[in-house]
Curated annotation (Swiss-Prot):
InterPro entries: DEFL (IPR010851). Pfam families: SLR1-BP. GO terms for cellular component: extracellular region. This is Defensin-like protein 161.
C-alpha cells in the first residue's frame, strides 16, 4: 500500500510541475508591422522577423499602411 501511495505522489508531482512550466512558457504575444515601405515577400519577411525579433513573419493587409501587403511580425514580448 505504501508503494502505491508513493507512486501516486510521484505522478501528482510530475503533473503539477508540467502545469507550472506550461504557464511560464505562455507569454504575451506582440505584433509589429515591419518594412512598411516595400511590398511583402514572404521569405524576406520571415527572415527579417526571425533575425530581428525571434518571431514568425507573415504577409497581411494593414489598413493603416498604404500598399497591398505588408510584413507583420508576431513574437513573444
Amino acid at each position: 500500500m505504501a508503494k502505491l501511495s508513493c507512486s501516486y505522489l510521484l505522478v501528482f508531482m510530475l503533473v503539477f510541475s508540467a502545469i507550472l512550466m506550461v504557464e511560464k512558457v505562455e507569454g504575451e504575444e506582440c505584433r509589429l508591422t515591419i518594412d512598411k515601405a516595400t511590398p511583402c515577400h514572404l521569405s524576406d519577411c520571415r527572415l527579417s522577423c526571425y533575425t530581428g525579433y525571434n518571431g514568425v513573419g507573415e504577409c497581411f493587409d494593414d489598413p493603416n499602411v498604404p500598399g497591398p501587403d505588408n510584413c507583420g511580425c508576431r513574437y513573444n514580448c
